[in-house]
Structures are given as structure tokens and as C-alpha cells.
């Protein structure tokens, strides 16, 4: 048994890893801010202690895992160095865990969490599987055959990973506070691909992915084109989900149904099916997994309050926003769609304000909250009005105090809440207004 201490244990990846190491019989505790987050509830349920940032809590026999948002001069990091504790970054800690198993890393600018979650679910139904998902979910089985991990490109966090198999869902410019251009992003994915040992399943219609030439792994494409090795075709999108056929190497693999919406949902599902097929799972096994899948946290989660339908989604990049609104159109074809968007980081708003406008235009009406910063970026020269003022379908800037008054008036509509920050507080304010 090893003693692990996580600095920033409520982070989505950190919470997942903490749960995995706890499941594997280790002692786990960690520190974070007092603010309530959705990731803390599984930690509390597992009996994992969450402390403040007191440096005296760090012991020499701990393996200290430093969250990505914490600098080397953080008091607890300095304390770990002072007492001689083993100190790992989050990516280094993940690599130490996954190297003990046959590992599948899911990467990409968009769709990582949904694809990781679905693949982990399919495999877990029929084989002992550990997984680490970016929605704060993690499960660790010490002797598991497979380990499915979400591989985050931010700050090149996925560079230490050496997976047996990988998925690359797409390459797009995001995280403008770190990546300065699309070429910069592509170079990071190229480095990641060079570390994959066996095979990469990659979206075949992505022009940047086509430029990647891995040192060792071979690439099999998936997508909607006949030239893709795994080709989704005969697609029938309905309100209950999507029906489609899948061909493999020009021959029919099988017919599938999944409770997913939009082209992006079909692509993510195709990627998961391709990996499961490669690992030897049958079409029947895969379809059973698809039928019992209930989705990932904050990925198109649907609820109801009064006469309003609520969709909660993590979308925060223009590409993701457009995909989420398109998915809502498929699910609710006869409903009015009202987007409630929380911009995430000032650098994103500065870099993508026009793209946000174009994506949000596809909703019937748009409300925007103030910008959510981050631990790395708490202020900037952008503002939410930079987006709202350019929208022909603009509503208003909403706050916790006016969320109920503004949104409850959208009778019979679908409210699509999108954001990667704390947008749940606006949903909660709306729901409390009905109590």
C-alpha cells in the first residue's frame, strides 16, 4: 500500500486518479479549495479526506501528486521537496499507473470524455477494466486487463503517456493561453502519436491528423467516407438516438444503435467500436454495451424543471457549441432552443469571439453569463458583451440573481446550458426559483 497526497484533488483528472488509486488499495487524501464541485462527491463517498493547503500535512512517506494548476512554489509543493517526499506531476502519476496494464489513450481537441466514457463502459461489461475519465470518474482494478485513459493535450500533459493503443478524435486550435497556433497543437499531437506502441484510430477527414506520421504505430481511419477503414453509413438520426451501419475494410461489420445525437456522437461511437473490435469484442457484445450506456457527466445531460427542458453540457469551444446545439435540434426537433453560455477564460474569448458568434447563431435565443476565468487566468481585457452584442438572437447577460426571472420566461423551451466553469450555479438558481 502506498500513501498518496493530491494537491488539487478536486480537479477532474486528479479526482479520477485519486479514486483509481483508492480502489487499488492505497491510502489517498488531498487538498483543495473549499468551493463545492461536482468532482468532490465521489471522493467523499469513497471516504477520501479533503484538507486545506496546510504544508505541515505533507509527510516524507507520501507520494505527492501535483495538480496541473499548481506551481512549483506552492507551499505544499515546497513542503514535499523539503521533507523528501516523492513528487509527481499529474501526467507522470497517470503514466506510472497505466503502464501496468494494456492501455488505450483517448486524445483529441473535442470528444475525449464522451469517447473515453463509452469505450470504458463497453469493455467493462465483459472484461476487467480500469479507467480514468475527464469528468471526475475513475475506477481502479489492480489486476485489470485494460486501462482506458483520457489524454489531455493542454500544456502537453499527454506527452509522458506511452499507450498501447490510442484514439485521436480531431485536432483543433484550443487553449490559446498555451498553444499559439494550430501548427503548435498539431506538433503536440505528433509527439503524442510517436509514443503510441501499436495502433492509432484517427478521424479520417481531419486534415491535421492526415499530416501525422507516427514513428511506430500504424493508423487506421474512421469516419463517414468510403475511404475510411471504419466507415459509418446508412445513418438514421431520430429523437431516441442514432441508427447506423459500420463497415470495416470495405466489408460490413454490423448494424448499431446508440442513444447519441449529432455527427460528433456517431464519430465518437465509431471510434469506441473500432477499438473494441480490435481488442476482439464481438458485434453483439459491443451493441449490448451501447444499449446500457448512460452517458458521461456534463455531456448532454437532460433534466426537466416545470415546463422547461434542461440540457447540461461541458461545451466551451465554438466547435463544441455548434455540435451541442445541432444535437439538441436532433433530440428536440419541434422545440425552441435557448442557449445559456458561460465563456471559459478570457484568452478564449479574445481568440474565438467571432467563432462563438457563428456557433451561437444556430440557437433561437442566447443568454450569456460573465466570463469564467481559471486559476491560471483570473482577469483579462475581454468581456461577455464582446459576443452578445454581435448576436442577432441575443437575450441578455444573466447572473445568479436574475437567472430565474429571465429563463423561467422562456416557457416550453429547451435551455441548453454550456460551459466548462461553474455554470451549474445558474441552473441551480433557476431551479430554486421554482421551489
Curated annotation (Swiss-Prot):
GO terms for cellular component: cytoplasm. The lineage of its organism: Bacteria, Bacillati, Bacillota, Bacilli, Lactobacillales. Gene3D superfamilies: Mur ligase, C-terminal domain (3.90.190.20), Mur-like, catalytic domain (3.40.1190.10), NAD(P)-binding Rossmann-like Domain (3.40.50.720). Disulfide bonds: none annotated. Pathway: Cell wall biogenesis; peptidoglycan biosynthesis. Its EC number is 6.3.2.8. It comes from Oenococcus oeni (strain ATCC BAA-331 / PSU-1). NCBIfam families: murC (TIGR01082). It catalyses: UDP-N-acetyl-alpha-D-muramate + L-alanine + ATP = UDP-N-acetyl-alpha-D-muramoyl-L-alanine + ADP + phosphate + H(+). Keywords: ATP-binding, Cell cycle, Cell division, Cell shape, Cell wall biogenesis/degradation, Cytoplasm, Ligase, Nucleotide-binding, Peptidoglycan synthesis. Cell wall formation. GO terms for biological process: cell division; cell wall organization; peptidoglycan biosynthetic process; regulation of cell shape. It is an enzyme of class 6 (ligase). The gene is murC. One of its GO terms (molecular function) is UDP-N-acetylmuramate-L-alanine ligase activity. This is UDP-N-acetylmuramate--L-alanine ligase. InterPro entries: Mur-like_cat_sf (IPR036565), Mur_ligase_C (IPR004101), Mur_ligase_C_dom_sf (IPR036615), Mur_ligase_cen (IPR013221), Mur_ligase_N (IPR000713), MurCDEF_pg_biosynth (IPR050061), UDP-N-AcMur_Ala_ligase_MurC (IPR005758).
